[in-house]
Amino acid sequence: MPSIADQLSAVLGDAFASLELPRELGRVSPSKQKPEVFPFQCNGAMPAAKQAKTNPRELAAKLIEALHGIPQIGAAEIAGPGFINLRPAEHLYGERAAEIAGDDRAGAPLAAAPRTVMIDFGGPNVAKPMHVGHLRSSVLGDSLQRLFRFRGDTVVSDIHLGDWGLQMGHLITELHEEQPDLVYFDAAITDGYPSEPPVTIEDLARLYPQASVKAKAGPERLEISRSATAELQAGRPGYRALLRHFIDVSVAALKRDFGALGVHFDLWKGESDVDPLIPGLVEDFKARGVAEESEGALIVRVARDGDKKELAPLILVSKTGAALYGTTDLATILDRKQSVDPDLTLYVVDLAQGDHFEQVFRAAEKAGLAEEGALEHVKFGTVNGTDGKRLRTRDGGTFRLADLIASAIERADERLKEAGLAADVSAEEHARVARMVGLAAIKFADLQNYRTTNYVFDLDRFTSFEGKTGPYLLYAAVRVKSLMRRAAEAGVTPGEILVDAQEERDLVLCLDAFGAALDNAADNRAPNALCDHAFTLAQAFSKFYSACPVLVAEDDAVKASRLALAEATLKQLELCLGLLGLEAPERM
């Protein structure tokens, strides 16, 4: 059964078509004027009148006349210069609510044309602890993969590790300085290396900053790191063995961190995985005439007529013979084309990388690696401190993501105790609830903003159980769960939904809007649309619950009907929370 909004759009589209006007002009939207009387509005008569060269109100009157006797229409009126206000027929509320209540997807349709979607997000570097900058990519990318899967698309997510570049040369050089006798540094030994890594994640976290500082202090040390990087990429066995250890140690730590955040990846590939593809890719680009020599380097010109800003060529191979980040990204596109062949690839990376991805995408299209529009940069803004600058620690350092999560969970625990919540559960259960609340606080705070918006990190506000926050939504879900338990104890079961009160209608219309919120979120790669829907739904249920007693209703049929509405709300709210990567506890 289509949504109420879609049903009204269809019959109004028929009315436009009967007057030989475009059917799409019949699209209705939620009304902001008198929504309790006329919940929907159509503005199509305005452009249609211009097209038909007639008065908008006169045209609107003809459209309303064409709606007479249509069973989906309860009432219609002309407003202002030619807007059409609409009220659905009463029977639609109960019918639609019953469908949502009986549907595992809570009324959400599947995508009409499912696709294979690759989502590249996370992108941490080997040997570097994740920082606050990884929060947005991780949370946004995870929500998008959940959303596209829910809509019926085949989704493959890839972390795309940064494991191929100068940072590896830095690590090798610093480790050699500390432990020069390690077998990996003996050029005469080419196999039989130890299976146990010579470093821990703590060692890597220490070695890289040390090496970076030394490289910045003097060109000699930087040159040594570059030489080590070149030998690694040329295939020196000992260095390749070290790289494997660095990756294994880092991935084990990253899986713990991402697991704590509730974020999943299908693939754990890195830049180094596509290195074998680069020579063939370069030769193919040359053979196609896509790449050309310029000042000793091999470049791909990507500027186009009509560009509003200058876009430099992509350097495929530097004048020193090195493959650069753009080359690796192109090889990754080739690898994904061969292994997954996605219809769409989303790169969830901060907006500062916009020019880089524009170069890569244009080069890929020019070489026939991707169709135009099949590669998309899902850009996002920064997480800032109260000073409006990127969030930093008190000493000016980078805020580690693990510390951020720990702080959120600690503050959530304090909030629970202040509110007297989760007080009658075991210490273990209380800790689990605090973790759910803390993660909900930082995830929802990030996702509720449109992704390109910078936002200020404020734990006190994020962990509040009041207002538009993750903890508020979790508490709203827990309230409904509590109601369902008490109903079961009283022997009350959900029944046929009978919509009568205005608050019931408002709740049904909110439930009805789930599909539109999903479409909005998917089309714009913007989970904030789901955040808005979840919050609006929680508010609508709160008003319904206050105005329409459930368990104390005198009429058993009304009691069963309202319980069914509560159950449908819980189902949809939990689905929405799940798409955002949030989980509501059973009790709080």
Swiss-Prot record:
Transmembrane segments: none annotated. A motif ('HIGH' region) lies at residues 124-134. GO terms for cellular component: cytoplasm. It is an enzyme of class 6 (ligase). The keyword Secreted does not apply. GO terms for molecular function: arginine-tRNA ligase activity; ATP binding. It catalyses: tRNA(Arg) + L-arginine + ATP = L-arginyl-tRNA(Arg) + AMP + diphosphate. Its EC number is 6.1.1.19. It holds the Pfam family DALR_1. It comes from the Bacteria. GO terms for biological process: arginyl-tRNA aminoacylation. It is found in: Cytoplasm. Keywords: Aminoacyl-tRNA synthetase, ATP-binding, Cytoplasm, Ligase, Nucleotide-binding, Protein biosynthesis. SMART domains: Arg_tRNA_synt_N (SM01016), DALR_1 (SM00836). Belongs to the class-I aminoacyl-tRNA synthetase family. HAMAP family: Arg_tRNA_synth (MF_00123). Monomer. This is Arginine--tRNA ligase. It comes from Maricaulis maris (strain MCS10) (Caulobacter maris). The lineage of its organism: Bacteria, Pseudomonadati, Pseudomonadota, Alphaproteobacteria, Maricaulales.
